[in-house]
Amino acid sequence: IPPYEESKDVIQRKLDQTTMILQNINAYFLLIDKDFIVCDTNYYSLNKLPAPEVGMTQKVGDLLHCRNAAEAGECGMHQQCKLCGIRAAIGRAFHKKESFQKVNASMNLLNDKEDKVIPCDVSVSGAYVVINGEDHIVLTVYDVTELQNVQRLLNIERKNSISAERLKSTFIANI
């Protein structure tokens, strides 16, 4: 059935279902404009936080409690922001009007009270979209910290295994 032929109840039920999914999926979705201002997000529902008042705006780094954004007073103002791979990928996507996938970065985020630094590994993808004639990007932010930690441990174990194998070979050769 084409959408325009569905009843308002069916459309509302589908909208409610989609909203519920987005509010409970294990990733942050952020709709941002070319100034890195967050226009919409599921961040608040995932963290069980009250949504900001209507009219209040936040940039991506401010919303995620980026340590550099907090130190500089605003997202994008810290000297380290120029070196941020995620910021560069977003800027390039807006400039080229295209999407990007799986940009990985290690970040230092602050807790809600901004008194504790939390190291975090993220994977960010961005889908370029035009809404009402305005350029936007839908960012998908995955916390991959646990995955990266397991990867680091596996690399250490692999190096230890190689070292043990060399010692074993040397020992056998000297017998």
Language-model features: where?
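N-terminal membrane-sensor/transducer module of prokaryotic signaling receptors
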Residues: I1-Q17, K48, A69-A72, Q80, ...
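Sensory coupling linkers of modular signal transduction proteins
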Residues: P2-K8, A127-S163, K168
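Sensory modules in modular signal-transduction proteins
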Residues: K8-K48, E165, A173
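Surface-exposed alpha-helical segments enriched in charged/polar residues
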Residues: M20-Q23, A88-G91, A127
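A generic fold-level signal
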Residues: N24, G55, C81, V117-D121, ...
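PAS/PAS-like sensory domain cap-loop motif
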Residues: S45-K59
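PAS-family sensory/regulatory domains
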Residues: G55-C81
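Per-ARNT-Sim (PAS) sensory domains and their PAS-associated C-terminal
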Residues: M77-V124, D135
